[in-house]
Amino acid sequence: MKKFSRILVVLAVLSMAMGLMTGCGNKKSEKSDNQSSVEQIKKNGKIKVGVFSDKPPFGYVDKNGKNQGYDVVLAHRLAKDLLGDENKVEFVLVEAASRVEFLQSNKVDVILANFTVTDERKEVVDYALPYMKVSLGVVSPNGKVITDVKQLKGKKLIVNKGTTAETYFTQKYPDIELLKYDQNTEAFNALKDGRGAALAHDNTLVYAWARENKGFTTGIKSLGEHDFIAPAVKKGND
């Protein structure tokens, strides 16, 4: 776990620094936008980073009200890189469905909330280099483990709004009834309460959750495309 965390830190800091400071294009206007964005962050004296409040081990708020997780570590490193002080970061709590809106409305400078790169999202945000590769996973109760999507016929599948899981099952399996929730906590509680037969999310998340919650198994370990997770900034601020 510690080795994985260190790898994520190095890769993410490099990708975010490249994304925020060098840009992806060659146009003068893009370079000007990049400089303006970084200069504004420096002028503000802090960087506002969107993170999850309930998605361990990536982003969560602990019992003392403190932000924790890989994404939080990455945010501190980014603040150190840009501003010379890892504490010059303001954490803004986001839900999956609000990540784009928070960027577009300047509520955050960067999204570090397990944001999967998709063609649709590329039209409205700019991504830095990816730092993690994921696919979808499906977790379900022991004794009623879902190992094939066909087993979900006539059953309810729990997903989070605004996630790749919601998009995937809506497009590929429109006959499967989806129970949609805003917060990860709500979704996983729904699974515990038996409101759905299974829950679909990024496989990295469901693996971690199943390890911490006895009585549940990730029966479908990889589903759909292998996608990438990357930091995102407002369109034009790449």
Please state what every model-predicted region is:
Residues 31-111:
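Extracytoplasmic small-molecule ligand-binding "clamshell" domains
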Residues 19-23:
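C-terminal motif of bacterial Sec signal peptides marking the signal peptidase cleavage site
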Residues 76, 88-151, 218:
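Acidic, polar ligand-binding/catalytic clefts
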Residues 98, 115-123, 168-171, 192-226:
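A ligand-binding cleft/hinge motif common to bilobed small-molecule-binding domains
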Residues 47-48, 85-87, 94, 104-113, ...:
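Alpha-to-beta junction loops
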Residues 25-31, 72-73, 77-81, 161-163, ...:
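Extended ligand-binding regions for polar small-molecule ligands
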Residues 47-51, 68, 149-163:
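Short loop->beta-strand "edge-of-pocket" segments that line small-molecule binding or catalytic clefts
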Residues 53, 132-140, 203, 207-238:
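Periplasmic-binding protein-like
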